[in-house]
């Protein structure tokens, strides 16, 4: 659901196939990379799944990135095309002549095309007026024209299914050592993350539930849980393109979602939202926090807030890295240990090792957090040295991802995060 416009699963599958045919008509095929430089909106989701449908790879980046950063991501990923919104046209068009691939196609979508008629008129008269008009002749392809060519050519979609080992998407992170890296995530990584998250939720199945999807699609948390977990579980994603506390609070009241994932700053803002004062939040089944540490004090405040508003749930902290899509550890339902980030997801293993080694330490001893399981990344793109440093085979025969985070595990398997080994500054998605 986007701005009140609803799409059924059957309609979404049709949209994916139509978008896949449009990418084929553009010349995109198996293994090709396309950059998606978009907020949470329908064209971004259509493209993410359509590219996967034809065996191509989505390269997910922040639409508010500086022009120089966008150039870096396009060159680094060897993208054949970039999808962005009309409001970012000038920034992206300006770097096209500087790209290594001079044939990179600029595909431009518009939010207004996906709005219900009444909202579309309102948008055109308000926010739309602030968006500079696109040049009549320019080095870009409008989304609607792109889709029209796809319909006209009507190329057959590939019959062979993708493999679980195929790369689905590239996300970016400071990695476990602090420098920007492209993280190659497979079909298995995304599907495992989704199934594990649902299993760990404690309230499966989630079909028919509603998730307020505000975490951005260029982050593992937003894409892996806010979108993919919800969709493979049969839940509705209510897409929120940008966080604004007043709008978000209104959506909570109006849409009555069952699941809300967010970062600590989002929940801090909700505590101050005046329009939630008398809200009934008994609809909530899962309130999940990740992306940064949830302080003991903030957890107490949010739990009290939820109770005051008739919600029978606690805020549950998760932990993970983009190197395993997103979360791989979660506070159990109806249970909490103070300061803990929870227990590992089903089919995922955690161990704590002496920093700089593969030697496991005893319970309650601090060391580096290591993770093994089906959501662990394929590799860092074109960076075998960092991949080798991060993914290591231990004496037990398993490949373990060394997180670069310090923590400990108690006798019952509850994990506690301390800090980054190389402390990095963490900011919100927008």
Language model: regions and residue ranges:
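Hydrophobic alpha-helical segments in the ANL/AMP-binding
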Residues: 20, 24, 42-61, 70-71, ...
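Conserved adenylate-forming
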Residues: 23-28, 150-165, 170-213, 235
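Conserved ATP-binding/catalytic segment of the ANL
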Residues: 26, 359-364, 368-428
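Gly/Ser/Thr-rich phosphate-binding loop
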Residues: 257-262, 271-338, 349
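Conserved AMP-binding/adenylate-forming core of the ANL superfamily
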Residues: 1-41, 45-49, 66-71, 75
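Short beta-strand->loop structural element characteristic of the AMP-binding/adenylate-forming
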Residues: 35-37, 44, 48, 52-86, ...
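Structural core segment of the AMP-binding/adenylate-forming
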Residues: 25-26, 53-145
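Conserved AMP-binding/adenylation subdomain of ANL enzymes
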Residues: 191-210, 218-261, 273-274
